[in-house]
Amino acid sequence: RPALLNIDTTRMFVDPAFPQCGRLMPELIEALTDITECFRTLDLPIYYSRRDDRRHPVQRGIWNLKLGNTDEFIYSEDPRADEWPEAYAPREGKDVIVFKNKPSCFFETPLESWLRYDRIDTLIVVGVSTSGCIRAGVVDAFSHNFRVIVPEEAVGDRSASAHRANLFDIDMKSGDVEPLADVI
């Protein structure tokens, strides 16, 4: 039983108004919209993950060392930052949202438990960024014995070379990278 796992595709990461946005985003939004519509038509479960609100340095933890003690990259004052574009936004009472503090949406969250309760055995993983949160989530999903499929047009990264290298590694080790048309 498959579920769609949409990782970090809030405006903060897909809207060019935010500095975290990557270059591949117009095509990515179209792919996210298409696969979301497919899952909704088939009445299959959709899970979303996004960052938790990490205003205090203790809550950000080791991010402080990696990114510096600034809010520029991991926090935005703009209230739209944590919203999803309307084209594929979660539906209240229907879709599930998991809040995370680290790259993997499985790390110290109830996601695995929720997926098991929902009898999910396969995850279609979409979102950003391929070299960070996508890869971390895919490896953890694989480690929890979920089959993982990544539609290559439905993931993105700020770095094209990192994107390609991580898709190669995912396909070799922990998931199946497939064309979006084959997944739909």
Where are the language model's segments positioned?
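Active-site acidic carboxylates
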Residues: 1-92
